[in-house]
Amino acid sequence: MRLWSLMQSCRWVAILPMLLLSSAYAQSEQILYDLRCENLVDPLSIDTHTPRLSWETAYSDKGNHQSAYQILAATEPTLLKEGDADLWNSEKTTSSESVLVGYKGKLTPDNRLVYWCVRVWDQNGKPSAWSKPARFGVGISQKEWSEDDYIGFPANAGNPQSPLLRTTINVTEVGKTTLLYVNSLGYHEIYINGQKVGNEVLATAVSEMDKRSLYRTYDVTSYLTAGSNDLVIWLGQGWFRPTIRWGFYDGPLVKVRLATYSDGKWENISIHNDSWQTAESGYSSLGKWTPNRFGGERINAAAVPQSMQKKDLDLLTWYPAATVQAPELNVSAQMTEGNIIVDTLKPTNVIEIADSVWVVDMGKAYTGWFEYKLPKLSPGQMVTMRYADHFHHGTTIREQMQFDTFVASGNEGDRFINKFNYH
């Protein structure tokens, strides 16, 4: 039994670890590190036409400081050389600025990614070595997103609250940089050939979807193989549901775009809406997702696929995905770090307070997921979990209307874990 602690981009401020650079001092007196665009490390999509760049410099001698910088930008990292940089060469610029320095190079939708590096001069005019390359993505324009329709689970085919959507991507040559853009109304997770893409959870971040929705960009180059590739998007309602004013459909929806870099140019890979299939996942929502009624998740273990591998997905019942006409929505790149699991906690105490009723004390208040393995139960047997941050009277927890239910499959190895809600 364990608890996943989540870092919420909308609630917590990340404390970044100090970077230890002392071992590098013997080789150079000026070490450039922590290159960022719009305060993000290598963002694959930004939501601005005027990006700003930042870097930090470690000096071996106290009192040294930057007196000038030079930035190179190019369409490929191999072009980050003076005379070759095809997007920008700032030349030597006299300035001590190293935070949110304006990018003044070429920036067009035809160049999905911009690679850049920087070097600096100290107060004595001594230059540093060039930094390691960084990159940022230009992203998808509002006009491009408006050309696509949302897809989701058909309204009358079953439970639409947490569906799987599946299609095939054909790849003729591996190794080409390939970016996947996902604009979901609700949460999403991405799987390619059975493997989860990235370590982010509860994506995208929270937004008021009647004003704007967010999209995430994934570098899926390393996940693709030559031939046919299985792409699965697992959706959850999150903040997009009928109990909230902008929930115009009873189920999450998604738009997807794919682009690949080949022979010096970016090409869009078409994924037609009619190629998508959808199935129930075994997960569904509980509660109203309103203050003091955020509920949780219901997991029907018998309906959850054993894995995201093709052999297990093929056992599900698939329907053609529904195309959904939606109100015109502003679509923006998510300009915050994603939610990730940052710690795993184990209970400090487990108390049986009645027949088949236990209190699990995690030892601290938390924001996160709950996970545990169950013994073999009878098919359809239900386990209910309720969550609170303190006891009310003795061993009675304070009711906060946060709860999950698990319906056993009757097989060995049943496991509960949250996916599209948290407590």
Regions found by a protein language model. Give the residues of each.
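N-terminal secretory signal peptides that target proteins for export/translocation
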Residues: 1-8
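Bacterial N-terminal signal peptides
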Residues: 11-22
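Extracellular/oxidizing-compartment recognition motifs
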Residues: 30-113, 117-423
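Boundary at the C-terminal end of the N-terminal hydrophobic targeting segment
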Residues: 24-28
